[in-house]
Swiss-Prot record:
Protein name: Probable aspartoacylase
Keywords, in A-Z order: Hydrolase, Metal-binding, Zinc
Keyword Acyltransferase: no
Name of the top EC class for this enzyme: hydrolase
Keyword Transmembrane set for record: no
């Protein structure tokens, strides 16, 4: 295994402040160099973090698109410029190349501690399997959504998102901070074990594969005209079947799920997703058998 440097990003969204605190605290207590691997810690969007807002011009976590990161676009938006800086500094061809990136986020939804993967890269599966095997964390596999692209971790050869909630934006929660510290510490230990052939991957990986997103009920003017149904609030990862309630509109009408397939909702009522016209996303459950190729690809980094 030739991994030499791993990038830990917090504050990709400026109002998600708990991982920033956790990283600062962790970095004071732990050596950035561990078992031959150097760990780089950086605030993804420092200007937004100082202002306490999600972003300045556009979502940084949708700004890692090749077509938008070309030279003529560098000065268009702050986040586009910032994405280019991060790639120039820490990208695989950057001045301090990192082979792996871990992006730390919080959510206002009741997601607990979870992993988010983008696509089916074997290296990512290997990394996620280490954490799911240790903590039993649910994995949200986001793929094939043309409306949502340009995620930070996709710009590196290997990476994943750690998502923890529920917690309000710009609110420090010691329990959330402790969870981040535990995950960062454990991930470092698990990578070291894998590097020294001291750990085996689980036989299978359970993932929740993104299928789409559902908007709030809206009136003829496009204004939100319904709330998430009381039975659905805080029920992330809980199965939904045909006929189960999703929303309660202003007329008292219950909007029910009318699909034939079982689904599992995620990011229910996430505040930041209102602007994206998303009340919740939904997934299907899939079990993926582990492959030796996962470790081989990871070791090739």
């Amino acid at each position: 295994m030739t991994v030499q440097r791993i990038l830990i990003v917090s504050g990709t969204h400026g109002n998600e402040i708990n991982p920033v605190w956790a990283v600062k605290q962790f970095n004071r207590e732990e050596n950035s160099l561990k078992h031959g691997i150097e760990y780089e810690y950086i605030i993804g969007n420092p200007v937004a973090y100082e202002k306490g807002c999600r972003y300045i011009d556009v979502d940084l976590n949708r700004s890692f698109k090749e077509s938008e990161n070309c030279d003529q676009q560098k000065n268009s938006f702050y986040e586009t410029n910032r994405a280019n800086f991060l790639l120039d500094e820490f990208g695989i061809d950057g001045s301090k190349p990192c082979q792996i990136v871990i992006d730390l986020h919080t959510t206002t939804a009741n997601m607990g501690t979870s992993i988010v993967l983008y696509g089916r890269r074997f290296k990512d599966f290997c990394l996620a399997a280490l954490l799911q095997n240790k903590f039993g964390l649910p994995i949200y596999l986001h793929e094939k959504d043309k409306a949502q692209t340009g995620f930070l971790v996709e710009a590196w050869p290997c990476g994943l998102v750690i998502e923890i909630g529920a917690v309000a934006q710009n609110f420090y929660d010691p329990k959330i901070i402790d969870r981040f510290s535990l995950i960062i510490s454990s991930l470092r230990e698990e990578i070291d074990k894998l590097k020294n052939n001291l750990i085996e991957l689980p036989k299978e990986l359970v993932v929740y594969v993104h299928q789409g997103s559902i908007d709030y009920p809206r009136d003829k003017k496009g204004v939100i005209d319904g709330l998430i149904h009381p039975e659905r609030i805080n029920q992330d990862w809980k199965m939904i079947k045909k006929g189960d309630p999703l929303f309660l509109d202003s007329q008292g009408i219950v909007h029910k799920y009318d699909g034939d397939q079982l689904i599992w909702p995620v990011f229910i009522g996430e505040v930041a997703y209102k602007e994206k016209n998303i009340a919740m996303s939904y997934t299907k459950k899939e079990v993926i058998c582990s492959k030796k190729q996962w470790v081989q690809d990871f070791e090739s980094l």
